[in-house]
From Swiss-Prot:
Disruption phenotype: Ivory phenotype under heat stress. Residues 72-106, 143-163 form a coiled coil. It is an enzyme of class 5 (isomerase). Residues 1-40 form a transit peptide. The keyword Electron transport does not apply. This is Protein disulfide isomerase pTAC5, chloroplastic.
Length: 387
């Protein structure tokens, strides 16, 4: 770049030479007054350095432009791929719609064809049976052929109906996780299902349909009977298993009731032991199913649960002396189970410690009497179930 000049006018005020206050120490030369009033300034910057700087800036702009061009090309490619996917999906949807329409149109046609064939068969059978024609109208070969065609049409209709059923979405029952603090109809159904299996949740919990300490204790006892983790939380898998077990128990009760009604000339067989009758309740599942429950049970205060009536049936039957010599006597203490529920932790496996002392023990501390199992080995039969 060429050097630039900038004229500057600096008007210096000229004081009078004949000042009385201060005099110049030298003599004024006539050249001193010949200095022009405008001064020319020349640039001292290096033009090569400026040119190099501008070249660097231009290269940086070119690189930025190339980067934006690459980004734009990438966006264009992504847009084209998305448009291609959309077009492919639209084609698939159209093909599926056409296929469904063809299936829907073919089913009524096949049904009408089958109805027409059946009508023709009936008419021909009537004509042959009436004897109006001299020769039989339907030969055996043609009859077999028509029957085969009808069977094939029926198979096609069945296959088409199965395809339509498979295409329909299957609605599955979703159960929410139940734990301490839950409330509502799900908790009530859980409590009634546990009650039917012999696990009592407590009067207060069942009255307000709340998942509190009584329900948690019943759930833990039921989990201990299954051999799963005793955390007092009912997951979807455990709820499904609970209601399946409940259905099995209902089927067993119905079968035993049928056998009792058929035994002894229609007289119902009852045990000599008198047990209070439990009121009839209704177990409601989320699938709106209702099962009538009527059982004779005894509530065990020590174990906080209802006794299973199947264990009470047959206790007072006459014992055959000949058979008693060969068979072993079942343990009375554990009722032939070989184990007893731990009375210190009520079958939960957790230590029975007051809340103010829980800070002194660890979180994973288990009941020292049953070692967290919830039950102890029967000390009468040593777990052998028989004496």
């Amino acid at each position: 770049m060429a050097s630039s000049s900038l004229p500057l006018s600096l008007p210096f005020p000229l004081r009078s030479l004949t000042s009385t206050t201060r005099s110049l120490p030298f003599q004024c030369s006539p050249l001193f007054f010949s200095i022009p009033s405008s001064i020319v300034c020349f640039s001292t910057q290096n033009p090569d350095r400026e040119e190099v700087r501008w070249l660097r800036e231009e290269q940086r702009w070119i690189r930025e432009e190339q980067r934006w061009i690459r980004e734009e090309q990438r966006w264009i490619r992504e847009r084209e791929s998305l448009l291609q996917e959309i077009s492919d999906l639209q084609l698939r949807i159209q093909s599926l719609e056409s296929r469904n329409s063809q299936l829907g149109n073919s089913i009524p046609d096949t049904i009408s064809n089958i109805a027409a064939l059946l009508q023709v068969l009936k008419e021909k059978n009537r004509i042959s049976e009436s004897g109006l024609s001299a020769t039989p109208m339907v030969l055996e070969s043609t009859r077999e052929q028509i029957v085969e065609e009808v069977e094939e049409e029926e198979k096609r209709v069945i296959i088409a109906e199965e395809k339509v059923r498979v295409s329909e979405p299957v609605k599955k029952i979703k159960r929410r996780i139940l734990k301490v603090g839950s409330e509502g109809d799900d908790v009530q159904a859980l409590q009634e299902a546990l009650l039917k299996l012999g696990f009592y949740s407590g009067e207060e919990d069942m009255e307000f349909s709340s998942f509190s300490s009584g329900t948690a204790s019943a759930v833990k006892t039921w989990q201990a009977s299954l051999g799963v983790r005793e955390d007092g939380v009912m997951t979807a898998e455990l709820l499904q298993r609970l209601f399946m077990d409940e259905d099995v128990e209902t089927d067993k009760d119905e079968a035993s009731t049928m056998k009792k009604e058929e035994a002894g000339n229609g007289a119902v067989f009852t045990s000599v032991t008198q047990v209070p009758e439990k009121k009839q309740s209704i177990v409601k599942d989320q699938s709106d199913r209702e099962v009538d429950v009527t059982q004779n049970r005894v509530f065990l205060l020590g174990e906080n649960r209802w006794e299973d009536p199947s264990r009470l049936i047959g206790r007072n039957k006459p014992v055959d002396r000949s058979e008693s010599t060969n068979t072993k006597t079942r343990c009375i203490t554990c009722r032939g189970e070989g184990r007893l529920m731990c009375l210190e932790c009520d079958g939960t496996g957790e230590p029975n410690i007051e809340p103010q002392f829980m800070e002194w023990v660890g979180e994973d501390t288990k009941c020292p009497y049953c070692e967290g199992l919830g039950y102890t080995v029967c000390d009468v039969c040593d777990g052998k179930k028989n004496l």
